């Protein structure tokens, strides 16, 4: 399926290089998207290598199925990467995966297609679901949630300073007419925001908060990181690309905690040696960002942060 909207894969070479792909390895692409990372991984796998892709988006699944028809080493499943643990168990891969890649957030085709309802830039139905067949849409949430809950979503997930004021404006307006279109909601948020940031649409943060809530993005990330650690073999690599501070904070803290071991809250110099207190992962290098060349070619890569870890036990 060709949606007509293109996607430029961020940190393509860097992410796949960080995986240290082995020709006979088994790899998981937790966020297939349009397959940029997956295709490069496949190009480095030998005949015995395997790649399993995950995505919730129906258009991504269609693209993945076409790739699977061309290459028998690749399989794609329509599941969140939060469920990669159970998928690995079902396929007998638990503790046997050589590397896992998570490229977080929303893809360019999702943002650019007005019918998906992710963007305030182009009017479309107020949906925002990565899988439009499951869960509650943004319109349904906005129509039923109390002002306090809407404000929490704007503030907690969108880091919006004027969350309460904007939520009250949304509730006041929905009592007159329900929200069905992205442009309609964006206009109400724009009017309710008293301090516009230079170069940024005043609805940006609220829309981010809604999208994260509707898709349970942070909850999925936390579950996916834990599942990834269990699925990896010793020496396996976990590569995560995030696009905003909330995601990156979760990834950074997860990796730091496991790299230090689990004895952070225990008294020092205890006369015991206990395996669970030893580090579970090794962090490789510092956070990596897109190059100047990449950010000029693809401005959406400016906020990308990549972190890499290796499983020790």
UniProtKB/Swiss-Prot annotation:
Catalytic class of the enzyme: transferase
Family the entry assigns: Belongs to the methyltransferase superfamily. RsmH family.
Protein name per Swiss-Prot or TrEMBL: Ribosomal RNA small subunit methyltransferase H
Residues that coordinate or bind S-adenosyl-L-methionine: 35-37, 55, 81, 103, 110
MF annotations from Gene Ontology: rRNA (cytosine-N4-)-methyltransferase activity
Organism: Pseudomonas savastanoi pv. phaseolicola (strain 1448A / Race 6)
InterPro entries, alphabetized: RsmH (IPR002903), SAM-dep_MeTrfase_MraW_recog (IPR023397), SAM-dependent_MTases_sf (IPR029063)
GO BP: rRNA base methylation
Superkingdom field: Bacteria
EC number(s) recorded for this UniProt protein: 2.1.1.199
CC per GO annotation: cytoplasm
Keywords for this protein: Cytoplasm, Methyltransferase, rRNA processing, S-adenosyl-L-methionine, Transferase
Catalysed conversion reaction: cytidine(1402) in 16S rRNA + S-adenosyl-L-methionine = N(4)-methylcytidine(1402) in 16S rRNA + S-adenosyl-L-homocysteine + H(+)
Compartments (UniProt record): Cytoplasm
Taxonomic path: Bacteria, Pseudomonadati, Pseudomonadota, Gammaproteobacteria, Pseudomonadales
Pfam families: Methyltransf_5
Function: Specifically methylates the N4 position of cytidine in position 1402 (C1402) of 16S rRNA.
